[in-house]
From Swiss-Prot:
GO cellular component, one term: nucleus
Keywords: Auxin signaling pathway, Nucleus, Repressor, Transcription, Transcription regulation
InterPro entries tied to this protein: AUX/IAA_dom (IPR033389), AUX_IAA (IPR003311), PB1-like (IPR053793)
Record's protein name: Auxin-responsive protein IAA5
Motif EAR-like (transcriptional repression): positions: 44-48
Chain spans, region Disordered: 1-96
GO terms classed as biological process: auxin-activated signaling pathway; regulation of DNA-templated transcription
Taxonomic lineage: Eukaryota, Viridiplantae, Streptophyta, Embryophyta, Tracheophyta
Organism: Oryza sativa subsp. japonica (Rice)
Domain PB1 intervals: 151-255
Function: Aux/IAA proteins are short-lived transcriptional factors that function as repressors of early auxin response genes at low auxin concentrations.
Cell compartments where the protein resides: Nucleus
SUBUNIT field: Homodimers and heterodimers.
């Protein structure tokens, strides 16, 4: 008689059923105070699956939009640029040398000129200060030019003429040249009134050396000196006349009867 058939476990199902799994044992060995089993702890991370490494610290934090917490890995401690490189060292050395040269050249520069201080109340504005400084410098220049050789231009007026002219006495070398130039300037007024008396000695407008001859003259040339006195032209040397003359005026002979040349006045005072 053959022996009875016995079941054989060729796949190992009985052994797997007999030995409990570690997860089930851990779950059963750590019950909650309430007596319920607790599952494994799951955390939500941003990253690829399997990217977790044992060197990285696990930060128990929720998903936020703030800055990342500081890490201690080598990758985070690396710098984007090296501290020292040959090119960087050379450029820093050249910059330092240029700065040293500028520091040495700075004391050698001359300090700016001090501006004239304008004091007053209410406070004077900047454009007013500049205007006062410019006018002061201009006045000094005019005084210097007057002291050196008289004014540059002299005003010329004529009785009956509605306008004035200006002449530069330095452009003429004698009274005759000045007289001819003034005749050309006011020719329309002189020729319309019987013109000037032209003598043989070509004195033209300067023919007024004697007071009794002024009545015979249609026009005579007078000037104002630095003392604001009106005199007849032609009584002083030309060089001296150009330094003291301030204004010129072509007057009618009848109006200039009371004006005497400087030479006649000086002779009358000496008597």
């Amino acid at each position: 008689m053959s022996p009875p058939l016995e079941p054989h476990d060729y796949i190992g199902l009985s052994a797997a059923a007999a030995s409990p799994t570690p997860s089930s044992s851990s779950c059963s060995s750590s019950p909650n105070p309430g007596g319920e089993a607790r599952g494994p702890r799951l955390t939500l991370r941003l990253g690829l699956p399997g990217s977790e490494s044992p060197e990285r610290e696990v930060v128990a934090a929720g998903l936020t939009l703030g800055p990342l917490p500081p890490t201690t890995t080598k990758a985070a401690s690396k710098r984007a640029f090296p501290d020292s490189s040959p090119r960087h060292g050379a450029s820093s050395g050249s910059v330092a040398a240029a700065a040293a040269c500028q520091d040495k050249a700075a004391p050698a520069a001359a300090p700016p000129a001090a501006k004239a201080q304008v004091v007053g109340w209410p406070p004077v504005r900047n454009y007013r200060k500049n205007t006062l400084a410019a006018s002061a410098s201009k006045g000094k220049g005019e005084d210097k030019g007057t002291a050196e050789g008289g004014p540059l231009y002299v005003k010329v007026s004529m009785d009956g003429a509605p306008y004035l002219r200006k002449v530069d006495l330095k452009m003429y070398s004698s009274y005759e040249d000045l007289s001819m130039a003034l005749e050309k300037m006011f020719s329309c007024f002189i020729t319309g009134q019987s013109g000037l008396r032209k003598s043989s000695n070509r004195d033209r407008l300067t023919n007024g050396s004697k007071a009794d001859a002024l009545q015979d003259q249609e026009y005579v040339l007078t000037y104002e000196d630095k003392d604001a006195d009106w005199m007849l032209v032609g009584d002083l040397p030309w060089d001296l006349f150009t330094t003291i003359c301030r204004k010129l005026k072509i007057m009618r002979g009848s109006d200039a009867a009371g004006i005497a040349p400087r030479s006649i006045e000086q002779s009358g005072q000496s008597r």
